[in-house]
Amino acid sequence: MSSSQTPAFEVLTPLRNRVGESPLWSVAEQALWWVDIEGRMLYRHDVAANTTAQWPTAQRIGCIALHAEGGVLAAMETGLLHLLPGEQGQLSARPVAVAHHARPDMRFNDGRCDRAGRFWVSSMVLDMSLAAPFGALYRFDAQGLSAPRVSELIVGNGLAFSPRGDRLYLSDSHPTVQRIWHFDLHDDGSLSNRREFVDMNQHPGRPDGAAVDADGCYWICGNDAGVLLRFTPEGRLDRTLALPISKPSMCAFGGAALDQLFVTSITPARPAAGFDASLDGAVLMLRPGVCGLPEVACAATRAHT
């Protein structure tokens, strides 16, 4: 039986994002990274100092992952770049891999490293209203950026990995699809046995960004419905958390004990009824009563350009 709750929350920073995405907790830094895709901004919040650094970028950043040499691996419009903040507040950008999208009007969207340090990233056509199935899922590892591992996505999203690293989750958050799948993920990075995990047409919200907790349960942001949904590994809904924002975009576990859940959000074109418009675009912090897993840094550090 699923339980619905309205959790207590904190607002991480007064900053508001146009399209806040890709929250990423760094255990080594005890800091939260995230991006504003349309604001073209990279952020890092130092929890101990309660300060937020920000760096503007020339291109949209779809998502980020920790980089083994410090900073982050960023999936940008033209490809993957290693972004490394300097001592004087500048941001160095080193190209790592070139994007080969199916069309020129595309960008990377959602991404995350698996337990072996391979970076997985999806793509999408910029104009969602076209419902164009040219998006794909790629893998970046020591051999470079792969050919598409999954094709015919409209808005690839919801990437997450089981605690043992043997299952990959992927969703398509477009309103005409709204489904989550899981795959068997093998030691060599190959995928097999695609099957439906959850039909989100049966639940509130579109399946946006996701995370997996230490129990192996899958947390997904219900965009447009203002909820966080937790599914067991068998695909059963067991918790619903009601949020004060209508468009939660992605969640990530963090904090010293990995018992906090950070949630980024999107500022809607028009305020949604029943929600607190002053929090649109905010980054929230909840304590869901379960712990997450540390994020793995991308192990592939050599450029493939």
Identify the meaning behind each predicted range:
Residues 33-35, 74, 120-123, 169-170, ...:
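Residue position within the beta-strands of beta-propeller blades
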Residues 37-38, 128-134, 173-178, 223-224, ...:
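Short, solvent-exposed loop/turn segments at conserved positions within beta-propeller repeat blades
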Residues 253-305:
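Blade-level signature of beta-propeller repeat domains, shared across WD40, Kelch, NHL, RCC1
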Residues 41-43, 79, 135-138, 179-181, ...:
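A short loop-to-beta-strand structural motif that recurs across blades of beta-propeller domains
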Residues 84-89, 182-190, 288-293:
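Short loop/turn segments immediately following beta-strands, especially the blade-tip
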Residues 15-29, 58-73, 101-118, 150-167, ...:
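Beta-rich, blade/repeat-based domains predominating
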Residues 8-14, 50-56, 94-101, 145-151, ...:
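A short beta-strand motif characteristic of beta-propeller blades
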Residues 90-151:
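Hydrophobic alpha-helical segments and helix pairs
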